[in-house]
């Protein structure tokens, strides 16, 4: 009997691997736990081909997401400046602050593209004027936008 068998994981298992990983485990662990629980299958040539096809599709999907984020970055940079109107007190000071939700709404109004407010990084905005903000569109793609805070 062989000392190790190759298993393709169906689920992520702590300290063993992620879904779709090819791992070598003891035959008893595979036969008595992983396979009956549906956490893995024995690696046959057909299953290995399926795993490769699945990984290829996932890579293509991730590449398409990144390209879409790059296109959104170009769209944001061509617009250049987003205006947010706030009520102003004395000395150009605004009431309240500009929130990431307001910036996300301004971007959506100008581009018809929804941006997650949690991906927007703003400086402290307490007066009217021009400010730079960073919008994270993808883990590898960030865009710099300019925000104009203007009185109502």
Swiss-Prot record:
Q: Name one Pfam family in it.
A: Ribosomal_L9_N
One Gene Ontology BP term is: translation
The GO cellular component terms are:
ribonucleoprotein complex; ribosome
Molecular function (GO) terms for this protein are:
rRNA binding; structural constituent of ribosome
Keyword Ribonucleoprotein among UniProt keywords = yes
Query: What family classification does the UniProt entry report for this protein?
Result: Belongs to the bacterial ribosomal protein bL9 family.
- Protein name per the record: Large ribosomal subunit protein bL9
């Amino acid at each position: 009997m062989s000392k190790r068998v190759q298993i393709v994981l169906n689920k992520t298992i702590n300290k063993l691997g992620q879904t779709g990983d090819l791992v070598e485990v003891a035959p008893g662990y595979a036969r008595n736990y992983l396979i009956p629980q549906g956490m893995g299958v024995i690696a046959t040539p057909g299953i290995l081909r399926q795993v490769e096809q699945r990984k290829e599709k996932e890579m293509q999907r991730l590449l398409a997401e990144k390209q879409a984020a790059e296109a959104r970055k170009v769209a944001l940079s061509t617009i250049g400046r987003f205006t947010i109107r706030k009520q102003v007190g004395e000395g150009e000071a605004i009431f309240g602050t500009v929130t990431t939700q307001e910036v996300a709404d301004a971007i959506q109004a100008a581009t018809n593209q929804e941006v997650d407010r949690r991906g927007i990084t703003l400086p402290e905005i307490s007066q009217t004027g021009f400010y730079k903000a960073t919008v994270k569109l993808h883990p590898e793609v960030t865009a710099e936008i300019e925000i104009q805070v203007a009185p109502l």
